[in-house]
Every structure is written in structure tokens, then in C-alpha cells.
Amino acid sequence: MSFEEFTPLNEKSLVDYIKSTPALSSKIGADKSDDDLVIKEVGDGNLNFVFIVVGSSGSLVIKQALPYIRCIGESWPMTKERAYFEATTLRKHGNLSPDHVPEVYHFDRTMALIGMRYLEPPHIILRKGLIAGIEYPFLADHMSDYMAKTLFFTSLLYHDTTEHRRAVTEFCGNVELCRLTEQVVFSDPYRVSTFNRWTSPYLDDDAKAVREDSALKLEIAELKSMFCERAQALIHGDLHTGSVMVTQDSTQVIDPEFSFYGPMGFDIGAYLGNLILAFFAQDGHATQENDRKEYKQWILRTIEQTWNLFNKRFIALWDQNKDGPGEAYLADIYNNTEVLKFVQENYMRNLLHDSLGFGAAKMIRRIVGVAHVEDFESIEEDKRRAICERSALEFAKMLLKERRKFKSIGEVVSAIQQQS
């Protein structure tokens, strides 16, 4: 079988593809054996085919982009080129944070296909762990490290402007995925759209209130402008709890197909916003045996620790590289400790506010927009689910409109507790 043109693979044709690709076959022993490979299609996301492949001497994952959105169908076309940007970002971020990004073994641009490390059990999607009430002792440490390194080292704090513009230009090609985000995060929840849904009839008035909130629309317009215009760093672009796989001592970030040079706060906010959604969903998963109160406190500690560790590590990287190639703040201008500290405090304050705003926007779209989260969807009783969603929605609306009043992540955590 020829693979010179794009062909959607199935379990049978994937065997032929792997055996004809040394970079893959050598990883799992398929180059030395005619034994059948064990292949399982496990894609549960919105966009792609995902296969787990096990051979005589190893395993790997194959991810293939389709020319449409899988969860909707061919009526919503989507470029296969997103696979190129995903593979490129996995490699770039993997170089910067190798402990927290799976290795890429092979990329085929024609087939829109990536072969990468299989994150074997007990790795599970973080979102599923949060639903199950599992604590991860290294989560805040690992995620803050990943975000600090990937965001700092792809920004003008480390790049010179020529290098940065070249990198920005390359990722401008991921325009379709950016436009999808613009639509589902910054537009559809604030207007009537066939793609929107919510827990009806319980949240009918809540969804209408979002569409009629002028102050909310003013804030979301500012965030959309920042998302479209601010090429601050190479961001993952979809860093929710479904894009992280975990064990008790491992944290791996996957699926950066939405990556581009955008505002740092979009990644930080997406991640923290999804932790906040997980917090508000806990009451829907509580039982007589486990009221989830202790687990909710763990989530809040994780939120606070993640930002505080990120802040500390980001500033440390800045200090270590203040005389390096970065051209955002030239060393001969910001040339004393006092002025540099002032600049850093201002930068991180703005970044916190950006992160809170984007996090709130991501929360809102998951409640009254398209593509909801399993944290809420797995709450079987509609009324119970709606109560949890309403609390999260009210908090997100407040956070979006009043984000600039928060001086620390601790104040945000206190506000979450008051809302619950």
C-alpha cells in the first residue's frame, strides 16, 4: 500500500505503514518480526485518530489528524496541517521540558501523522483523575516547571527580536486552529449559536444572561484582541486538564495542536481555569462515604502552589538570563536591581491578570458553549449538574470582570471558597 498521498488509517493499514517506516518499526520490533502488532484505536478527543501500538519489543502511539473535526463530522472542515504544528511544538517544548513532554519518534507531513512515546498505564488523563478524586503530590511542581520553561524560553525575555519574528511567522500558519479558538472561546458563548449548549432548562436564564451582559462582552473583546495580537511566547494553545497525563510521580503534557505564538496567560489560564472547574464539579461527585471536602481543599492548594511556583521559577529564569540574548528588557537599560525588580513585578502582575481573564473565558465556554468537560458531564442528574455549573459560571463571570482587583493567587482562592 502506498502512502504518498493522505490516507486515513485504520488498524489494518496502520500495520503496513509502521512496517514501511523504520523510525517506527524499529521502536517496537516490527522490523524483526512478522508477528501481528496489537493495535487499539483510543481517540476520545474532538479532532483526531489515536492508536496505541504494541509490538514484540516496545510500544508507541500514532496520532493522525483528519481533514475535519471528528466530533462534528465532515460538515466542519479542518486543516490537516495542525499535525505539523503539533509535532513541531512537541519537539520544541520537549527540548525545553524533557521530563514533561513525550518524545516524538516520527512525523509524516503528507499523512498528517505523528509517532510518539506511549504513556503507558498507570498514566491517565488528569481530568479523569480529578473526577475520581485522586491527589497528585507532584502536579503543581511539574506543571509550574513545564509552563515556566516553555513560556520563558520562547519569549522575548530570551529571544532576540529577529529570532522571535521568524518563529512567530512560522506558527502564523496554524490560523485555522486559532480561528476555531476565537469562535468557541471568545465569540459563540456571547451570541446565539447552533453549537452552543447547556444544561437546559436549568441554565436557560444563565446562558441568556451571558449573552446580554455588556460588561462581560467588553472584557471578552479585550481578551480576544490580546489572543489575536500578542505573540508573547510559543503557547500550547489548549492546555486543559484533558491535555495532561499523570501518575503519582509523572506529569506529561500532550496534544499541542493549537500551538502558536500567543499570550502566555492563555496557557496558564486554561490550566488553572480547568482546575477551578474541577473544584466546582466536586459537589456533584460527592457521596455519603466521601463528601469531597478534603479533595476540594487539595485542588485549591494545587491552584495556589502552581501559580506561586511558576512565578518563582519564571523570575529565576529571568534573573539567570538577564544578560542573555533576550531583547524585551535590554541589560544596559534595566541595569540595576531596583529597576529590574520593578519591571518583573509589573510583568508578573499583568500576567496574573491575563491568566485569570483567559481562565474565566475558558470556564464560561465549557458551560454555555460547545465541547463541555467530563467533570460536569459525568454528573448524571441534570439538576445536580446545573447547580455545580451555575456556581462555576457565576465565579467565572466575576473573575472575568474583576480580575484586575486580585493582587495574588491567594486572593483568588479565597474568592473561590466564598463562591462555593
From Swiss-Prot:
Positions where N-acetylserine occurs in the chain: 2
Documented EC number(s): 2.7.1.100
Pathway it works in: Amino-acid biosynthesis; L-methionine biosynthesis via salvage pathway; S-methyl-5-thio-alpha-D-ribose 1-phosphate from S-methyl-5'-thioadenosine (hydrolase route): step 2/2
GO biological process assignments: L-methionine salvage from methylthioadenosine
Highest taxon above the source species: Eukaryota
Residues spanning the membrane: none
Role this protein plays: Catalyzes the phosphorylation of methylthioribose into methylthioribose-1-phosphate in the methionine cycle. Contributes to the maintenance of AdoMet homeostasis and is required to sustain high rates of ethylene synthesis.
Designated name of the protein: Methylthioribose kinase
Gene giving rise to this polypeptide: MTK
